[in-house]
Curated annotation (Swiss-Prot):
One of its GO terms (molecular function) is metal ion binding. The modification Cysteine methyl ester is found at residue 111. A lipid is attached at residue 111 (S-farnesyl cysteine). Residues 3-69 form the HMA domain. Belongs to the HIPP family. Coiled coil: none annotated. This is Heavy metal-associated isoprenylated plant protein 2. The keyword Metal-binding applies.
Amino acid sequence: MTTKKIEIKVDIDCEKCKHAIMEAVTELEGVNIVSLDQEKSILTVVGTMDPVCVAEQLKKINKKPVVISVGPPKKPDPKPDPKKDPCFIPYCYYTPRDMVSVNTYESGSGCTIV
């Protein structure tokens, strides 16, 4: 099943009602996220569960649910990749080395036996 976002209008009078609603909905299989807006009296459920099952679960605790919308959840905006500064490889300069060779020739008697 696909993930759905379900918005349900439910009367939320007190903290006890809020707690009972949260407990009842989170017991369902396939529920990923549950949020309650107490000022607007809206329950938002995200998951793979059936909206009818959510409404029935709320009826079991004597609430009168009104389904506002059922649809796919909003996908988060993709964050733009931060631009990376280009990495410059330093150029290694070639420094020629001077090579000095010294050849010494002995001039002399030519006798190698000492």
